[in-house]
């Protein structure tokens, strides 16, 4: 193992962030398939896909661990809490977009303009609300997925 980890360019005084984990081909392949780094996605589709993932996985903790988890409306409360958090996250994306891209600059980069960021934000909101709604419908109507 001592021969495997060595200083970058054999100079111990040069900092480098490459590790056996971060520089492996498996890690790079996994990261390249994430919607944030995938080549060829429009900002709207990028936001939609990220929103779909977030809305779908956020409803579970709210429904199972929320204060109304043992009541009849626990799932509905979890769904509404998820929508509330999605609104807060979208508001955060709006504030970031206004601060970072307030003056219109045309860098040519994919998410570095106000218009692209607004498309990303809209896709995120629609995707997250849609997937949270889909998860709510699945959890409330399919007996196999019912929360107990």
Swiss-Prot record:
Belongs to the PsaL family. HAMAP family: PSI_PsaL. The keyword Chloroplast applies. Its main location: plastid. The keyword Chloroplast applies. This is Photosystem I reaction center subunit XI. It comes from Thalassiosira pseudonana. It is a multi-pass membrane protein. Keywords: Chloroplast, Membrane, Photosynthesis, Photosystem I, Plastid, Thylakoid, Transmembrane, Transmembrane helix. PANTHER family: PHOTOSYSTEM I REACTION CENTER SUBUNIT XI, CHLOROPLASTIC. GO terms for biological process: photosynthesis. It is found in: Plastid, Chloroplast thylakoid membrane. One of its GO terms (cellular component) is chloroplast thylakoid membrane. The chain crosses the membrane at residues 48-68, 73-93, 122-142.
């Amino acid at each position: 193992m001592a021969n495997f980890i060595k200083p970058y360019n054999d100079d111990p005084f040069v900092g480098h962030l490459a590790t056996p984990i971060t520089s492996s081909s498996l890690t790079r392949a996994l990261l390249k398939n994430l919607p944030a780094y995938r080549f060829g996605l429009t900002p709207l589709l990028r936001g939609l896909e990220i929103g779909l993932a977030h809305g779908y996985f956020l409803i579970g903790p709210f429904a199972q661990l929320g204060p109304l988890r043992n009541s009849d409306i626990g799932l509905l409360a979890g769904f509404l809490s998820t929508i509330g958090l999605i609104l807060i996250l979208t508001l955060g994306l709006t504030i970031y977009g206004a601060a970072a891209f307030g003056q219109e600059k045309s860098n040519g980069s994919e998410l570095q303009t106000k218009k692209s960021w607004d498309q990303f934000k809209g896709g995120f909101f629609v995707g997250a609300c849609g997937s949270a709604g889909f998860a709510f419908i699945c959890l409330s109507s399919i007996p196999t997925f019912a929360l107990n």
